């Protein structure tokens, strides 16, 4: 029976499931009335960590019997093939679960169908929602074995507590609304969650409030049991820094990029010493443009704009040098960055696309190079993303799925 299978796989499920899959399961089970709204809210709000949510969800479903458990298992098989392989689950045509026995201890069992898929795709296979490609265990182990002295170590999933911070300013008192920023925020949050980070999201802040959030984030105790962090800033900007929501010609509400590095350095955030700290900045860095389009920079561009264009632009200052940092900015100094009101920012869109496609096999700097190359093409000459102040001493592999 499905409930017995689910009970047998409870521990593996708790240790392996991602927050994205948990959220998908909750939505599915609510829609099919396996869970009611109160149960769903309890699972989401009464539990802090992903593992706690997973444990509570699994226990709720198994108590409801085989039919509820079968819906749970079927969703995993259909939507998260990586997790289904780890749990050794298959959903047959009759909706009965087939329990697949493990051939060898310590191995990573894949079905013949999955193995064929791995060979075709060079080892990767889609993660939740068919998006992020996860790294098969044997490939992760091979990379680590051959290059461990040159790779930042990652902590084990059950005990690590990765955190990420996203600050997104959309609505301003004196500047235009950043239409399309909601797409960037949603997609970036989902990506980081699938990479194993608990994401803290803060919206529409002044420079002072952004500094306060940085201070609180740097002090989070979870960093002690984390192996890395991401900080993502999306706002209007100019050469001096990132605009707060009250910026105007009279009010210099600007977060200097140096402040970000100072708040996250070894002195202010010792828990992240010798661990990768990745800073992503989507904002303008000045007024110059390679083409003439609507933009998000604060000042007036000397080059004007095209009235029929639907792109808009966004900016920052050079980063402060610190060990184990890497900053990836949406444009070169003094230039604008562009945002589509429906698709979101060109930079964020390309970054997410390449992270999903290559994080399983490439280190972060190599992924960033691929993003830059995507803007080199003739139809993408609007901006050139820039990697700056790189003080990483090793290669940073994300090993998605592990």
Swiss-Prot record:
UniProt cross-references to InterPro entries, sorted A to Z: CARD (IPR001315), Caspase-like_dom_sf (IPR029030), Caspase_cys_AS (IPR033139), Caspase_his_AS (IPR016129), DEATH-like_dom_sf (IPR011029), Pept_C14 (IPR002398), Pept_C14_caspase (IPR011600), Pept_C14_p10 (IPR002138)
Catalysed transformations (reactions): Strict requirement for an Asp residue at position P1 and has a preferred cleavage sequence of Tyr-Val-Ala-Asp-|-
Residues the record marks as active site: 236, 284
Domain CARD, residue spans: 1-91
Prosegment location in residue numbers: 1-118, 297-314
Function as written in the Swiss-Prot or TrEMBL entry: Thiol protease involved in a variety of inflammatory processes by proteolytically cleaving other proteins, such as the precursors of the inflammatory cytokines interleukin-1 beta (IL1B) and interleukin 18 (IL18) as well as the pyroptosis inducer Gasdermin-D (GSDMD), into active mature peptides.
Identification of the protein by name: Caspase-1
Organism of origin: Rattus norvegicus
